[in-house]
């Protein structure tokens, strides 16, 4: 998943479907370059002395990029990303002595799997791709972001309908009403944040972060519904404090996410007008959280990122894909 998340997961062995599967198969995961246990690790962290105040947003992004390159190494970054991951999977297949690859891929992993099938069609026995990423969006980071925002809004709509049906939270099943209600709650938290037991503020930013995280998994919807209900009532339980304190992503995985996305996709240089148009389009694609009071029209991370792979140049787009591919939950 990710990109930026490890593929080695020792806890998978405790899932009952895996127990049955292991009667016939060995399950092998790997951490892509720069991720998890792979070394060197992608590192974009800055010391307190390196984090400057009173600078432009563009300079802040450039400082972060410089930290990524300095800490990780430019030569290392040139060999990180989806392009290298595809070749690494085939090297793993060869090292195992398997004539063909049998694999399961999730989310971002489906991008690697699809590229593998495209590049090595005769090396595929069978691959299941769950939560499919459209690899044709690799050439256009904006299209990828736009589709993701649209998917988030569609999920929010389903969540609101579920909330109304189960009476789990005060959102309406009507799309426009639900968005308005959510905006009213965001506005309320923005002007009068709640205070948790540690004295920390719970503002609109915390609700947006919690929402984008918990929407992803239907099993997390009850927690999100409880948070919305409690915030509407001006209270915060221990359960919701725990959910808020859980890290959405580690610093390492966040660093790797940004670097790999930008290495793979990058962005063309935009005029201020084009940049504003794109940010408006993204906001309109996910209107439920279109409440960014500090929205900037400065260049984003990928637009300023200087190192790119040759992934799109080397794609074999007219190849016949192997028959042993199963696509799930596109």
Which residues fall in each region the model found?
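Gly/Pro-rich cap/lid or specificity-loop segments adjacent to the active site
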Residues: 1-206, 259, 265-330
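Residue-level recognition of short, well-ordered coil/turn positions
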Residues: 97, 194, 219, 235-236
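Flexible "cap/lid" loop of the alpha/beta hydrolase fold
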Residues: 133-151, 227, 236-250
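Charge-rich, solvent-exposed alpha-helical interaction surfaces
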Residues: 181, 185-188, 210, 227, ...
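Structural motif
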Residues: 194-209, 216-220, 247-255
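Short helix-capping/linker segments at secondary-structure and domain boundaries
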Residues: 215-229, 233, 267-273
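Long, low-complexity segments enriched in small/aliphatic residues
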Residues: 237-265, 269-270, 275-276
